[in-house]
Amino acid sequence: MSERLTAKSEPGGPGDASPPKLLDRVRDAIRTRHYSRRTEVAYVTWIRRYIVFHRKAHPSTLGAPEICAFLTWLATKRQVSASTQNQALAALLFLYEHVLQMPIGQVEHVVRAKQPLRLPVVLSREEVAVVLSHLEGTMWIIGMLLYGSGLRLEECLELRVKDIDFDRNEIMIRRGKGQKDRATTLPAAVIDSLCQHLAEVKRLHSADLADGFGRVALPDALGRKYPHAAVEWGWQFVFPASCICRDPRWGPPSRFHLHASAVQKAIAVAVRRSGIAKRVGPHTMRHYAGFRTMPSDVKGHSRAGGTLLLKAEIRFAAHSA
């Protein structure tokens, strides 16, 4: 009997003696390797689309030619970007190597999506100041950290209380891009507001504990090693969500961090009110003149191309100033 390809229900329920479904096996393999929740959702989505594209044939009966056909269809018919096509390829290679134990190797003769060479949008200091002036409270603090510390949005939202060192004016980013740790500067201008914010978060955490909650999702297997760490103050998110919910990967009800879409919407509104015509998002706040002079490993660029691109921005900004 072939494996079922859908994953509408979770395995392990009452009377469930059937083998794990394919997409559940994919999820297990991803979680075993401690990939992010976003990666899990993306990979499962691409694998499901690949199966549907080939009329629900089991991937074990398919191979490199079928992968090539799917990727070419994405580029020619769906006109996806190069990064999207690469993500789909990564998902399928993961499926064959780590789930089906059928390494594919090199996939040849794929029509590649074109990678446009674009410089990132760069704001002047004055423009950043105007955008920040239209942010308030928690969103202003997040905007300041994106701008002054050079954090990516997910890195900022995943900060734990223990990651902020007020004595050294330093922020530790744990398992950032490329699963690397790094340290960056805590802007002096945000310290007072951040301290007040954390005092409010601590009161919220105390109230959660009194109500029988107060647990937070922990990375890797830390929860099994240290069962009480989930309720400790240092492990709480700096920017917690407004409500308690159940995380499918974590289990018990907990207060997750603020959702990225909330920050994206707040910055979009601030940009609109500022009258700035550029296409600005949270990542744009990371690109500012003073931060570009720092070494690439401090900024978190995993390759030299990121630093070279920022040098091009400096030249562009100098000519347009």
Show the residue positions of the predicted features.
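Conserved catalytic core of the tyrosine transesterase superfamily
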Residues: M1-A321
